[in-house]
């Protein structure tokens, strides 16, 4: 299961490669949306490396605050919507509504950041003269 969560990191990389080739003007927006969709479960997988050994534990230590940051909005909203009971340990399929909400939230956030980078890049290149 840890391996599958770690494979999620490949999704934004693949989207970036495809966007670089076919949709260059929206490269960062597409990559940001893909990153936002997978960042919460992927950081959980990265945190699970903490238990595999001393070298992998370094990645796990870095991943813990990242998962706490990216996991809490989905959990709070899932509790408020009644999808997950409060004051219980979240395990198994109880992660699904939490991670779905996190995917929506963080894909919007990182998609907007990527859109801003794309817009800045367009304005930067738009101001340059193309005459030699």
Where would I find each of the regions flagged by the language model?
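Membrane-interface helix-boundary motifs at transmembrane edges
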Residues: 19-33
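Juxtamembrane non-transmembrane "cap" segments at the membrane-aqueous interface
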Residues: 51-81
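Cytoplasmic juxtamembrane regions at transmembrane-helix boundaries
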Residues: 104-132
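Alpha-helical transmembrane segments of polytopic membrane proteins
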Residues: 1-8, 58-68, 94-104
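Individual transmembrane alpha-helix segments
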Residues: 81-109
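N-terminal signal-anchor/start-transfer transmembrane helix
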Residues: 4-23
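Periodic glycine anchor positions in long extracellular repeat architectures
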Residues: 31-36, 114
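Aromatic-anchored segments of alpha-helical transmembrane domains
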Residues: 38-47
């Amino acid at each position: 299961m840890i391996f599958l969560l770690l494979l999620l990191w490949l999704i934004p990389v693949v989207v970036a490669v495809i966007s670089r080739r076919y949709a260059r003007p929206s490269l960062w927006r597409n990559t940001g949306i893909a990153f936002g969709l997978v960042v919460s479960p992927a950081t959980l997988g990265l945190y699970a490396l903490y238990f595999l050994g001393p070298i992998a534990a370094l990645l796990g230590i870095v991943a813990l605050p990242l998962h706490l940051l990216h996991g809490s909005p989905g959990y709070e909203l899932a509790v408020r919507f009644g999808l997950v009971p409060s004051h219980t340990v979240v395990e198994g399929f109880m992660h699904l509504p939490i991670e779905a909400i996190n995917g929506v939230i963080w894909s919007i956030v990182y998609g907007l950041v990527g859109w801003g980078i794309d817009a800045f890049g367009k304005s930067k290149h738009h101001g340059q003269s193309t005459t030699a």
